[in-house]
Amino acid sequence: MKLGVISQNLEQFEFEEGLRYARDLGIQAVEVGACGLWGRGYCNPEMLLANRGEIDRWLDTFASYDLEISALGGHGAPLMPNKTVAEEYSREFRLTCEFMELAGLRRITLLAGLPEGAEGDTAPNWVTFAEWPFLRDTLEWQWEKRLLPYWREHGKIAADHGVTLCFEMHGGDMIHNPVTLKQLHDEIGPVAACNFDISHMWYQGIDPIEALYYLGPLVQHVHAKDILISRHNARVRGMMDSTSTEQFADRSWTYTLAGWGHDEATWREFVSTLRLLGYDHVISLEMESEYFEVEEGLEKSVSFLKPLMIEKPSGAKWWEIAGMDRAGGLTQE
């Protein structure tokens, strides 16, 4: 495993200055924003495709700082009822997939999106309460008429370019838990995988370890951030809290640094479970805390997570190195 960071947390620096900062911090990989809501300061696929000779130079710049590219970032609003927004995302997505094939990159992290609740609606509609039949009908319409047609089409585009869609299970999104992610995977095929962000499990009341076992090899990329739960707010608001994230003192929970909401033992179990399930890619830091300055947050996050990373393959077992007969001579002839 390697410790990475999202390029959004480096945008205060010029490109190479940011890569140097990340390397010196002990970071080994960068998840690079390329389309959707991500900034383009570290990757602009449209510009690079227009001057293809620059692609190798762009890749070489990361290598010169001993940094891998763990994925491209494409979080956006693909199912937005506003056609202008949705069409622009689709255009950027197609360009990004084309660029990824030329650059030899395989993973894109992204959101599945949130559509309207019925034909002609102008606002997205997140259905999480299905006691009433009309809400169940709304959810079925969203899956059958919007989510599945879109990602069948765009999943084929990605697959044609050798790209894996690493969907993040996120509140306010059609794909927000392991069951919905697995359902999408079953519907559109192996092009659909998971970008596992443990923080989104905690505020939804999902056991992250059980979620990892449920998803298994579908986990193809990992984010690392924590949540801090405000007990006195949570007791009266519940965890599905619509208070603005900027009003963090009034919320039931807020994003925080790894280790600042859940203890080291919890994070050790998370990292160990990833290894047990065969994950050996990047754990990508996100500094999204509203009450930390970005660089301080990154530095504290690296200091906490770096010692927990399992960096080397397991290799020879300890008892093999010791020259022991593990069977203890108890095998029957």
What residue spans do the PLM features occupy?
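Glycine-rich, proline-tolerant flexible connector loops at the mouths of alpha/beta enzymes
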Residues: 33-58, 112-119
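C-terminal helical cap(s) of enzyme catalytic domains, especially alpha/beta-barrels
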Residues: 294-314
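Conserved, mostly hydrophobic/aromatic
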Residues: 5, 22, 30, 62, ...
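Active-site acidic/histidine proton-transfer and metal-coordination neighborhood
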Residues: 17, 61-65, 79-193, 268, ...
